[in-house]
């Protein structure tokens, strides 16, 4: 594997952790997905390679395949400090057709199948809109553990829709492309889709643990597996709180390694989500990116991450979001394999063209993942990761080869 010399121009310290740079330059492997992590023995960070994405899926069928795309009907083989956000987005319309279909849901965590969930459906639709992006909508900010939001933002709140949120549901599909060098082990990412509980989630294990003999994919898959269990428990008695789900899952996860996490739930008061690290999600409405979760990093390529115990970041360090959604919205959740290689405009463009062509969520997720992979191996095109590296004082150009997970949800009226 070829390496690219990444020269460090301005070494800095952030958040009390010295960034790891040998002298004034270091060898940075463009295809390794190298990322910093907390070490087992202390809070000192070491630069280690990160990779891919492995799905933990609420409606899944176990398969030996590594590259997977799913519609909730079959399945096989990163950003700022914590806070609470309330997002109000304009009304949008997208006509979705409906196709009934019932089958049992199973969670697939790489090679392990978890307890059945409930029912599933697949809805499909079309949309024809132009592509553009807009600034973040009105929002409120507060600590993640404070579920009541503070007033904030400078834009006026858009009018609310007359459509009852209780009549909305998520129709989700996913696609996963592992790092070519990690296909044998399935990579380090995990994700889930819980159709009945209206929840999705992604996690990106920090692959640098492989240097000390640890498969971080075990941590991310266990974290997502326990997240599904926590979602099922909450679904039986009360509304689902993504932060509580992540806290419970983190407390139960004992595997070695570390991981980012993003959990999204559709509830009666809108879309509720928590994001910790450099995975994230985007909300697209009428050809517009109305929201993208900000990156949580202690420094460049130094993502927030959960680890067994409390030696790294904790769930409450994540950002909590409450977002108004409308029928016709498209939600894209992904690991940094997506967001390091695709700009907002590119993701939105794929969503618009895919829905216009009548693709279901699985098809849209596949298109996003495929474009991200194309960008990842293109050394002549500027990428979000390259932009961030350059802003941090490194000489870097091209994409970043990594595991890629894309989970796409259509918001539709039931």
Curated annotation (Swiss-Prot):
One cellular component (GO) term of this entry: chloroplast stroma
Co-factor: note: Binds 2 magnesium or manganese ions per subunit.
GO molecular function list: metal ion binding; protein serine/threonine phosphatase activity
Residue positions binding Mn(2+) 1: 204-205
PROSITE patterns found in the cross-reference section: PPM_2
Domain PPM-type phosphatase: 174-411
SMART domains tied to this protein: PP2C_SIG, PP2Cc
Keywords: Hydrolase, Magnesium, Manganese, Metal-binding, Protein phosphatase
Keyword Membrane: no
Cofactor(s) needed for function: Mg(2+); Mn(2+)
Enzyme class label: hydrolase
InterPro entries: PPM-type-like_dom_sf (IPR036457), PPM-type_phosphatase-like_dom (IPR001932), PPTC7 (IPR039123)
Catalytic activity: O-phospho-L-seryl-[protein] + H2O = L-seryl-[protein] + phosphate; O-phospho-L-threonyl-[protein] + H2O = L-threonyl-[protein] + phosphate
Binding site for Mn(2+) 2: 204, 336, 402
Domain of life, source organism: Eukaryota
Keyword Metal-binding: yes
EC number of the protein: 3.1.3.16
Similarity remark: Belongs to the PP2C family.
Protein name (record): Probable protein phosphatase 2C 80
Originating species: Arabidopsis thaliana
């Amino acid at each position: 594997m070829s390496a690219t010399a990444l020269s460090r121009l301005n070494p800095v310290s952030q958040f009390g952790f010295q960034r790891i740079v040998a002298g004034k330059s270091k060898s940075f492997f463009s295809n390794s997905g190298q990322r910093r992590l907390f070490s087992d023995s202390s809070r000192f960070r070491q630069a280690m390679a990160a990779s891919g994405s492995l799905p933990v899926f609420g409606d899944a069928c176990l398969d030996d395949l590594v590259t997977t795309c799913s519609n909730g009907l079959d399945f096989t083989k990163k950003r700022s400090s914590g806070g609470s956000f309330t997002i109000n987005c304009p009304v949008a319309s997208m006509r979705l057709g409906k196709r009934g279909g019932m089958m049992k849901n199973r969670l697939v965590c790489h090679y392990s199948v978890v307890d059945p969930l409930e029912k599933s459906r697949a809805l499909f639709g079309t949309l024809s809109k132009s592509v553009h992006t807009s600034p973040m909508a009105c929002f409120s900010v507060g600590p993640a553990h404070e579920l009541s939001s503070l007033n904030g933002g400078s834009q006026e709140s858009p009018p609310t829709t007359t459509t009852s949120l209780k009549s909305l549901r998520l129709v989700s599909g996913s696609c996963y492309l592992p790092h070519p060098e990690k296909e044998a082990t399935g990579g380090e990412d995990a994700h889930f889709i819980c159709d009945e509980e209206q929840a999705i989630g992604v996690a990106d294990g920090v692959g640098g643990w492989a240097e000390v003999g640890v498969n971080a994919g075990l941590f991310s898959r266990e974290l997502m597996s326990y997240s599904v269990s926590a979602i099922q428990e909450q679904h039986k008695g009360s509304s689902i709180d993504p932060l509580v789900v992540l806290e419970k899952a983190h407390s139960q996860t004992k595997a070695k390694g570390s991981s980012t996490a993003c959990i999204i739930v559709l509830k009666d008061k809108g879309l509720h989500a928590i994001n910790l690290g450099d995975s994230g999600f985007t909300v697209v409405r009428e050809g517009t990116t109305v929201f993208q979760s900000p990156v949580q990093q202690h420094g460049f390529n130094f993502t927030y991450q959960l680890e067994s115990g409390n030696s790294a970041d904790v769930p409450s360090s994540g950002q909590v979001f409450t977002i108004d959604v409308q029928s016709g919205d498209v939600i894209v959740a992904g690991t940094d394999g997506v967001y390091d290689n695709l700009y907002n405009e590119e993701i939105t463009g794929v969503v618009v063209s895919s829905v216009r062509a009548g693709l279901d969520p699985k098809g849209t997720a596949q298109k996003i993942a495929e474009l991200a992979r194309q960008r990842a191996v293109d050394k002549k095109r500027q990428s979000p990761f390259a932009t961030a590296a350059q802003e941090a004082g490194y000489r870097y150009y091209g994409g970043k080869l990594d595991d890629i997970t894309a989970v796409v949800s259509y918001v539709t009226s039931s």
